Amino acid sequence: MSRRLIYVLNINRESTHKIQENEIYTYFSHCNIDHTSTELDFVVKNYDLNRRQPVTGYTALHCYLYNNYFTNDVLKILLNHGVDVTMKTSSGRMPVYILLTRCCNISHDVVIDMIDKDKNHLSHRDYSNLLLEYIKSRYMLLKEEDIDENIVSTLLDKGIDPNFKQDGYTALHYYYLCLAHVYKPGECRKPITIKKAKRIISLFIQHGANLNALDNCGNTPFHLYLSIEMCNNIHMTKMLLTFNPNFKICNNHGLTPILCYITSDYIQHDILVMLIHHYETNVGEMPIDERRIIVFEFIKTYSTRPADSITYLMNRFKNIDIYTRYEGKTLLHVACEYNNTHVIDYLIRINGDINALTDNNKHATQLIIDNKENSPYTINCLLYILRYIVDKNVIRSLVDQLPSLPIFDIKSFEKFISYCILLDDTFYNRHVRNRNSKTYRYAFSKYMSFDKYDGIITKCHKETILLKLSTVLDTTLYAVLRCHNSKKLRRYLNELKKYNNDKSFKIYSNIMNERYLNVYYKDMYVSKVYDKLFPVFTDKNCLLTLLPSEIIYEILYMLTINDLYNISYPPTKV
């Protein structure tokens, strides 16, 4: 859509009515000026373009550089009619500074013209921050504006120091921030091609830029790039690694570039692998303390493929295992504390101990409860690990803390109580004894009324009575649901399926379904693996032929569903 032209000057007025200065300033500051207009031609030929405003110190050139309708064509006309490019505003701003930090769609030609009209040719100290401010403006203000490779090259060729610092940052610090924020969701920035980014960084290095310069917080440009949450592009990161940034530099918080990435709250598996591989290939073996921090901090962070990443890290760092402790906690403690269910599954699969205590004698369940930042997920995380907990004392401790647990989802809370009543057979009786205690009743007032809580417990208790009355072969449905041994539960599979469709169980139907599916899939994958390995078991040259099939089944049942699945369907290597 064409822009509406605004005319404020009547150049045909009587000679006794001269054009006022404020009209000229308004014309250059706010009007959409056509470079072919007679008004512009009249003004540049009949008006002193270098006359300054008394307060701001603006000339016609300064005014136009702040004009939202700026065009390169009008600027060229002003430059051709003798505007002084060395005059500063009252605040000390040079015209070329305003051009590079305020104007949009500037051409390389007008930058060259303006620089060439200054006899100092950017050698004066007033221009020392010009390159830094140009790139900073594209990072902070003109986010949709491109960083012109030719302009960067010209400024460097004219002698601008690429290592000049302002507020601790160099121009490269700001450029790396631009590269990072291009991929940050919601930024709406103009894309920067990898080839162009590589050429611009190469220009800096050719002119003596320090790629590992530190800001006031001790961060190199690469530190800043990796610390931007949800921004990193694997191909851009790979390109930046070709410049071999220093991986050993620690910032003021003791973080190397890799640790900056690990603590950025968003990790891409492929980038994590790339960074570690680059370190070990170009630097050498990573110090054990850094390896430990990487693994523990990774667990606290959101990642795109957590199961793949924790498997990679545990296999890569051989001296980090399920018993390794950092700040008094095992890996499994931290995974529970930060509700990282993928990592919890993996660590338990490789024999991590869910019942191990921290150095200050806290159980994993207590760590979940104590982490108030994750309070919306507390109940769900506790529900998740209850399937692994058989210690009645731990369950009882959880029950005692029910009044203080944050309730964000009433259905999850109801399911949690049903689990507690199922696993702790003293829960209901203790609740009944305390029912009339004002202190006990008041403890529940923070998240829900006591009457509602009491109603949930009563409903769960009634269903547990029904579970105890429901027979399953030689035992009760109550005992079956309390059992965690899938091999023992196998003989009750058909009965579980029948009860799974029983509409009389409204609260415990979910737990029945979980038990049924767990046993069903375990049995299915054991059979698949047995059939797949049958040629091995029957090979006369294999010692396994000496084992009865019952023993082989016993061994297979010791594996997790995940292990059995991977044997049945080995992952394809890309």
Swiss-Prot record:
UniProt domain F-box: residue ranges: 541-574
Keyword field contains Repeat: yes
Question: SUPFAM superfamilies given for it?
Answer: Ankyrin repeat (SSF48403)
Species this chain originates from: Vaccinia virus (strain Ankara) (VACV)
* Protein name per the record: Ankyrin repeat protein B18
SMART domains according to UniProt: ANK
Query: From which lineage does this chain's organism come?
Result: Viruses, Varidnaviria, Bamfordvirae, Nucleocytoviricota, Pokkesviricetes
User: What InterPro entries does the database record attribute to this sequence?
Assistant: Ank_repeat_dom-contain_49, Ankyrin_rpt, Ankyrin_rpt-contain_sf, F-box_dom, PRANC_domain
Chain positions of ANK repeats = 56-87, 135-164, 167-213, 217-249, 253-285, 327-356
Listed A to Z, the keywords are: ANK repeat, Repeat
